[in-house]
Amino acid sequence: MMKTLGAVLSLSLTLLSFGGAHAATMSFKNNCPYTVWPASFGNPQLSTTGFELASQASFQLDTPVPWSGRFWARTRCSTDASGKFVCETADCDSGQLMCNGKTGIPPATLAEFTIAAGGGQDFYDVSLVDGFNLPMSVTPQGGTGTCKMGSCAANVNLVCPSELQKIGSDGSVVACLSACVKFGEPQYCCTPPQETKEKCPPTNYSQIFHEQCPDAYSYAFDDNKGLFTCSGGPNYLITFCP
């Protein structure tokens, strides 16, 4: 998770009380023409950390409040001859459907949340900081304030530079690495000595992500465009291939 939202998560969980706690319902809808295998990682861990979602299917999962974490969808999953569950994109390397506290291996499109207690201000985004593997959107349901949709509706794989492409078993581009994940250099990861927004402007690579998905995080300091808020205890709809 990018540094900016990570700081928000930590601060929010420190300041928010548990008074008036209620469950926030996450509804998942798969509009992709193929099955996906969503997964979760967060604090505290949710009742399920992985499930199968067929094309056009829906699923609901409650989070406690406060809660911080992320969701993503694995693609091209199967069980190998040894009985190990594996996925071509965003695999969490648990060897099974449940990720059990493990995060997805980049590249992966992420939906990230800080859910506040007592109807306070939630923070959420769709992030490409770890790369892209499928289109995704996050839509608040109810709530007060701006409550805008975060989204990456475009198929970034179609414009992914060759050096960032992840190639699947059939030879097609199945995901697109971020420049940070691919090269690990400060100019792309906004790490020392380029750890501030002033020292770490967008790069040509992050601009590709931003042009395709202007309502998603394209790199670590994209919070002015990619980070959204909603108050009053909303629920959320997470759509794959919106």
UniProtKB/Swiss-Prot annotation:
Gene3D superfamilies: Thaumatin. The keyword Aminoacyl-tRNA synthetase does not apply. InterPro entries: Osmotin/thaumatin-like_sf, Thaumatin, Thaumatin_CS. It is found in: Secreted. Induction: Up-regulated in the abscission zone following treatment with propylene and in both the abscission zone and surrounding tissues after wounding due to embryoctomy. Preferentially expressed in the abscission zone of fruit. Also expressed in leaf abscission zone. The keyword Glycosyltransferase does not apply. Residues 1-23 form the signal peptide. It comes from the Eukaryota. Keywords: Disulfide bond, Plant defense, Secreted, Signal. PROSITE patterns: THAUMATIN_1 (PS00316), THAUMATIN_2 (PS51367). Disulfide bonds join 32-241, 77-87, 92-99, 147-230, 152-213, 160-176, 180-189, 190-200. One of its GO terms (biological process) is defense response. GO terms for cellular component: extracellular region. May be involved in protecting plant tissues from pathogen infection. Belongs to the thaumatin family. This is Thaumatin-like protein 2. It comes from Prunus persica.
